[in-house]
Amino acid sequence: MFTPPTDPKKSVKVKVSQLCELCHARKAVMKRPKNLQRICKECFFSVFETEIHNTIVSNNLFHRGERIAVGASGGKDSTVLAYVLKLLNDRHDYGVEIVLLSIDEGIVGYRDDSLATVKRNQVQYDLPLEIVSYKDLYNWTMDEIVACAGIRNSCTYCGVFRRQALDRGAAKLGIKHVVTGHNADDMAETVLMNILRGDVARLEKSTSILTQSSGSPIKRSKPFKYSYQKEIVLYAHYKKLDYFSTECSYAPEAFRGTARELMKNLEAIRPSCIIDIIHSGESLKLKPKRAKKAPPPSHMEIRPDGSVSLQNEFIDGNRCERCGYLSSNKICKACMLLEGLEQNRAKIQLEKDSTTEGAAKLSRTLEKLQF
């Protein structure tokens, strides 16, 4: 239960209409986006932290002795997440070990600066940090990918590679739980995106606070599921937290922006629409699919490491034949994208060579001409 913090200092006379609606003692400095409640800074800190604690406890997200990796990008969400989790872990004795896990996508002028923020957070919060790069995992950076495949599909590549990179980074650390800073706005946007795209398969699980791929030992949780983005920004501002606020240079091309604009228009009319959309997503249930017949045992091959290779069908826990990552197909999505990139790079190089050869031939022809 939330209890308004007491102020040891002598109260100052303030108009009743300007008083905090919770403690009725201090001046209100903000209006909460989700319920338009006017509250003071101290009460905001308490209610914000209490709501996140209640979300963690009610969903049984953490277990004593567990090691968790916080996906740290240096942005407002992950910075506040790391700060609040450390605070609540100390205050309520969750008994978990927190590690910062960052992904370096290789975006010059964006990720290099944000990683500098993460490194400062590591010192400020006294937490261990692990950085995993696209270049080390895939031998590509996002800048190289965009130069090769164009900017329009950049978020598709980055989304697939980033999810796999987080899992690989966690596995490297021996951690089976990754915590991300997805907030209520992100969750509502995802619901709208899946509706607009007609993506029924993802719609049902788009509001899950705890997810885990079939056969994967690594689970993911979102303690900020019910926390509004505006409140996260205000918390970071009032707490004077060190975070990186520049948007990714490739983000404007993302389809998510369409859902975000739609939601902003809805929120202007109905402030509670973000939570309403999440609750609607939670209520959605798809009709159960007909169970598929299991493939004959002769189609299975057990590898020395215990993973399963199938010729035709898929069994939960199967691994990509190229990289060993969990996949519902013989070749995982990341490897398929990498194959397309390599083919495109070879094509681009061939075109460059042809252009160079053509220019050289034209130059030799001109040299032979006599005027």
Curated annotation (Swiss-Prot):
PROSITE patterns: UPF0021
Organism: Kluyveromyces lactis (strain ATCC 8585 / CBS 2359 / DSM 70799 / NBRC 1267 / NRRL Y-1140 / WM37) (Yeast)
Localisation per UniProt entry: Cytoplasm
This protein's name: Cytoplasmic tRNA 2-thiolation protein 1
Chief location category: cytoplasm
UniProt KW keywords: Cytoplasm, RNA-binding, Transferase, tRNA processing, tRNA-binding
Molecular function in Gene Ontology: nucleotidyltransferase activity; tRNA binding
Functional summary from the UniProt entry: Plays a central role in 2-thiolation of mcm(5)S(2)U at tRNA wobble positions of tRNA(Lys), tRNA(Glu) and tRNA(Gln). Directly binds tRNAs and probably acts by catalyzing adenylation of tRNAs, an intermediate required for 2-thiolation. It is unclear whether it acts as a sulfurtransferase that transfers sulfur from thiocarboxylated URM1 onto the uridine of tRNAs at wobble position. Prior mcm(5) tRNA modification by the elongator complex is required for 2-thiolation. May also be involved in protein urmylation.
Entry EC no(s): 2.7.7.-
Similarity-based family: Belongs to the TtcA family. CTU1/NCS6/ATPBD3 subfamily.
Pathway(s) the chain acts in: tRNA modification; 5-methoxycarbonylmethyl-2-thiouridine-tRNA biosynthesis
GO CC aspect terms: cytosol; cytosolic tRNA wobble base thiouridylase complex; mitochondrion
Gene: NCS6
Alphabetical list of InterPro entries matching this protein: CTU1-like_ATP-bd, CTU1_C, Ncs6/Tuc1/Ctu1, Rossmann-like_a/b/a_fold, TilS/TtcA_N, tRNA_thiolation_TtcA_Ctu1, UPF0021_CS
UniProt xrefs under Pfam families: ATP_bind_3, zn-ribbon_14
SUPFAM superfamilies with a match to the protein in the record: Adenine nucleotide alpha hydrolases-like
Domain of life assignment: Eukaryota
GO biological process: protein urmylation; tRNA thio-modification; tRNA wobble position uridine thiolation; tRNA wobble uridine modification
